[in-house]
A protein has these predicted regions:
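Sec-dependent N-terminal signal peptides
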Residues: 4-12
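Ankyrin-repeat inter-repeat connecting loop/turn
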Residues: 51, 84-86, 119, 150, ...
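N-terminal segments that cap or nucleate solenoid repeat domains
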Residues: 20-64
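Ankyrin repeat boundary/linker residues
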Residues: 55, 88-90, 121-123, 154, ...
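Ankyrin repeat structural motif
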Residues: 36-44, 70-79, 105-113, 136-144, ...
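Ankyrin-repeat-protein effector appendages
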Residues: 19-27, 146, 179, 188-191, ...
Length: 246
């Protein structure tokens, strides 16, 4: 199913950007890997490459640059591009904010939020899940301050608190609890945050999160269909092309 999704979205991207050759896309991806900001700037400027389409690996240029720690390219080129859309995820459903979150890059996350990144967008996981997964307390607090849903769930009912417990980060666990995280929300297999901590060898965190029973009702969460989201972006681009701003 994932392979089909990637193929479908790749076709959408290729259709919308037919003038961009696979060779040029690969060249851009390689320049990002080298953190060659000058070359990336050249490709955007001289080849008129759109910063929002997909590279051969399924990432947008910004997502890939953050993933590979090409921060010179991110800060000097990509974040300054007037056409950049920081909301566009990779074909895996990972947004730039999610990758900034898991890396604990608070400055980058603040910039992305200022530029319009959606703190609660959920293609399966949220930025708060990612921050909790790597025990990023400062990032967790930043996201919560900007309206992150503390009890957001994945399709398998995994919460940020569950991920923080799994990362064995007491500071992250406490930051989420202070914000109202519900420790009785268990995943779809009935595993609680306390169980997750115990499985990772932390009896202290497990005891801290101990509950008598899991919450029985399934938690509702709006998980966005990635295919439909990308289609809506493409339709928006088409409408803008037909009705350019004055």
């Amino acid at each position: 199913m994932k392979k089909f999704l990637i193929t479908l979205l790749s076709l959408i991207s290729i259709s919308a950007h037919a003038q961009t050759t696979e060779t040029t896309l690969s060249e851009l991806q390689e320049a990002i890997e080298r953190n060659d900001a000058a070359r990336v700037a050249y490709l955007f400027r001289e080849k008129r490459m759109d910063p929002n389409f997909y590279l051969p690996n399924g990432d947008t240029p910004l997502v890939y640059a953050i993933r590979t720690d090409a921060m010179k390219t991110v800060n000097l080129v990509m974040l300054r591009h007037r056409a950049l859309n920081v909301k566009i995820p990779s074909l895996r459903g990972e947004t730039p904010l999610m990758l900034a979150a898991i890396k604990g890059d608070v400055d980058l996350a603040q910039t992305l939020l200022f530029m319009g990144a959606d703190v609660n967008v959920n293609f399966g996981w949220t930025a708060l899940h990612y921050a909790a997964a790597s025990g990023q307390k400062n990032m967790i607090e930043l996201l919560l301050k900007n309206g992150a849903e503390v009890n957001a769930v994945t399709e398998r009912q995994v919460t940020p608190l569950y991920m923080a417990a799994r990362s064995v980060s007491r500071d992250s666990v406490d930051a989420l609890l202070v914000a109202g995280a519900d420790k009785t929300i268990c995943n779809d297999q009935g595993i609680s945050p306390a169980d997750a901590a115990r499985q990772r060898g932390s009896s202290a965190i497990a005891d801290h999160l101990a509950i008598k029973a899991c919450k029985m009702e399934k938690q509702e969460q709006t998980i966005i269909d990635l295919t439909e989201f990308i289609k809506s972006l493409e339709q928006g681009e088409s409408a803008n092309a037909q009705n350019p701003a004055p």
